[in-house]
Amino acid sequence: MPAASPHKTLADVLAYLKANPGKMTFASSGNGSSDHLTAELFWLQTGTSGVHVPYKGGGPVMQDLLGAQVESSFMNINTAMPQIKAGKLRPLVITSARRSTLLPEVPTLEESGVKEANVQSWQAVAGPPGLPADIKTRLRDAILAAVADPATAKRLADMGLE
């Protein structure tokens, strides 16, 4: 939520959604995106509704969220972290099954009373079809070594990646 939002907790949001069905805007990076589907799952599990505002990517979502053109969004933590740290966004919940080590004070959806709505995203490394097995092994080993390196782990955490 934008830091200036009157909604300080998920309970505030739920109360507003129930009192004002179909009024609150939820921005997403596009139809069918993980943030769009997270909002749909949230509405389903809470018996509420909102206005889905699809954008063409996360950049325009952030711009309009910060500019109060839309009221809320579900977004990946690494996208939100710089604005959270700057005090421009207020995280209300984490959608994964457990709290984030990056924002340990922020409760999960389940802790906040929303059951069966755990969502998290992940990143992958892909190669071309037919990549030789020895190259796959070398690539895997290099990635595992990199993420095990404390300096790399810190850089990833600083970018909002766990």
Cite the ranges covered by each PLM segment:
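Hinge/capping helix and adjacent helix->loop/strand transition within the periplasmic-binding protein
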Residues: 1-60, 109, 122-155
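Alpha-to-beta junction loops
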Residues: 20-24, 48, 66-75, 88-91, ...
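Periplasmic-binding protein-like
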Residues: 93-129, 159
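Short helices/loops that flank or line small-molecule/ion binding pockets
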Residues: 17, 41, 45, 59-70, ...
